[in-house]
From Swiss-Prot:
GO BP annotations, alphabetical order: translation
Taxonomic placement: Bacteria, Pseudomonadati, Pseudomonadota, Alphaproteobacteria, Hyphomicrobiales
Species in which this protein is naturally found: Bartonella tribocorum (strain CIP 105476 / IBS 506)
Keywords linked to the UniProt accession: Ribonucleoprotein, Ribosomal protein
Alphabetized CDD domains for the sequence: Ribosomal_L29_HIP (cd00427)
GO cellular component: cytosolic large ribosomal subunit
Gene coding for it: rpmC
Protein name, per record: Large ribosomal subunit protein uL29
Entry GO MF terms: structural constituent of ribosome
Family affiliation: Belongs to the universal ribosomal protein uL29 family.
Pfam families xref list: Ribosomal_L29
């Protein structure tokens, strides 16, 4: 997910995307533990997407409070 796409999203859309990515991260961890994970780079990508979304959420929340 690109930063440009995130800036265009509303808070609710970001929260939905964050929940979806957390579920995916959970499933990827299980697949990794059982040895079924084929694309190991996806774990890193999802983790970074989660961090990116949290960063933009925090920025939007702080902007709305000011």
């Amino acid at each position: 997910m690109r930063a440009r796409e995130l800036r265009a999203q509303t808070l609710d859309q970001m929260k939905d995307e964050l929940a979806k990515l957390k579920k995916e991260q959970f499933n990827l961890r299980f697949q990794k533990a059982t040895g079924q994970l084929e694309k190991t780079a996806r774990v890193r990508q999802v983790r970074r997407d989660i961090a990116r979304i949290k960063t933009f959420l925090h920025q939007k929340l702080s902007e709305s409070k000011v």
